[in-house]
Amino acid sequence: TVDSIRPMPPAELATVHGDPPQPSPAFGESVLLAELSEAAVAGFLDAALAPASGALLSVELRHLGGALATDVPGDALAFAVGVVPVPEAAPEVAAAAKAFARALDPHAAPRAMKNFTERPGEPERIYGSDLARLRTIVAAWDPEQVIAAGHPVLD
């Protein structure tokens, strides 16, 4: 349980979740859940407790609300991450995270949440109906794609 709700100065905001202060080698997968139903919660728990999930550091179920409720077509987000301490551990950690995400496919929304999409690909799932407009803007104003983005909109 992460319980870090308290008054704090802006300099401490990065500590709220307890992530390491420096980048860490890891592999993660996320699934935007269409609704936070009993079946989706049961699917999350089954995936989290599956033997393959032993390679994961943590799994999270995040309720989405506030401003996200108007722009993100889902009720919750499931996220799994595993640390990759040595390169040899990468295949096992990646397989565990992918298995976790696949187990939640029956409950998945058609879109993905950009902040939790670890690797580029499938811009349609990230940007939805905004993709055509974004492509037009980027093609007109940055055709050489000088402005780097983790999730490019042009092919």
Show the residue positions of the predicted features.
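Soluble FAD-dependent oxygen oxidases
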Residues: 1-155
